[in-house]
Amino acid sequence: MTIIGDSRGVRPAYNAGILSSVTDLIGNTPIVELHNLTRGLDCRVLVKLESRNPGGSSKDRIALNLIRTAEADGSLLPGATIVESSSGNTGIGLALVGRLTGHPVIIIHSAFISNEKRALLTAYGAELVEADWEAGPENPQNARAIADRIAAEIPNAWRSS
């Protein structure tokens, strides 16, 4: 087992190999058994640490799968722009994987998105467009309508939904 040091002492590395891309970190997150919860019981509690994905959530898996599938089936061309409405972790996953795979990303988001999520999205290179998240489906200012409009204006743009 490889051991790595950190500020709290020594801990086992969950993946000590050298990877060729940050996308190789997506998935295969560690599983930890919570012994203290089951002391004296005839059961096991295992938790999957999805926060260990590069974007901080299980949505990185979804983004990677969506992009790889779309690239494989030809609906997402090399270098094409990804346009999606999201105010959460799916947008962060798409921005991260999009950047790593050479796709510009435009995220249409709510005005209520947290500063932390906004910072992550921009750090991953996403262009942000604010939408009225409470606008009904018939309102041209709702997030989906804005995403559809932007995607229609950009040659070869791709939407996951």
Language-model region placement:
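PLP-dependent amino-acid enzyme catalytic core
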Residues: M1-S161
